[in-house]
Design a protein with these regions (language model features):
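Structural motif
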Residues: 29, 58-60, 67, 83, ...
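A short, N-terminal "cap"/entry segment at the start of jelly-roll beta-barrel domains
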Residues: 1-27, 108
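Short beta-strand His + acidic residue motifs that chelate non-heme Fe in jelly-roll/DSBH
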Residues: 43, 61, 78, 84-89
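Conserved short histidine dyad/triad with adjacent acidic residue
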Residues: 31-45
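Short acidic-glycine-tyrosine-enriched beta hairpin
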Residues: 66-80
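Ligand-binding loop in jelly-roll beta-barrel domains
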Residues: 81-105
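Glycine- and acidic-residue-biased ligand/ion/polar-headgroup-sensing regions
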Residues: 48-59
């Protein structure tokens, strides 16, 4: 399949307050991620390289000890194996994450 409508894709809850619709090919995965106001994605790491762009809302993003407040249009790149954490502000947020290679645990 080459084309998708994200609104027709089932939503998967990754952790409480954080939901994603994922799409994948052979070597990369896209995730449209919606984060509830005040939600926190705790510090974690994975082997996958991750990049993304903020689509809506404000996030406090920490990568390898460096913290920035990100707004729509801001882009982040996280090398594999690097600690990162996300804290959502007073309103919901939405990001587009890109992973390589595909995160098998997010396929459904």
């Amino acid at each position: 399949m080459y084309f998708y409508n994200p609104n027709e894709r089932e939503v998967k809850e990754l952790i409480s307050g954080i939901h994603a619709r994922t799409f994948w090919g052979e070597n990369l995965m896209l995730a449209v991620v919606e984060l509830d106001a005040g939600s926190i994605l705790p510090t974690h790491t994975h082997l996958h390289e991750q990049g993304g762009i903020v689509l809506d809302g404000t996030l406090e993003f920490s990568i390898d000890g460096e913290t920035r407040t990100l707004v729509p249009g801001d882009i982040y790149i996280i090398p594999g194996g690097v600690n990162h954490k996300v804290t959502v502000g007073e309103n919901h947020a939405k990001v587009l994450d890109i992973f390589s290679p595909v995160r098998e645990e997010y396929k459904y």
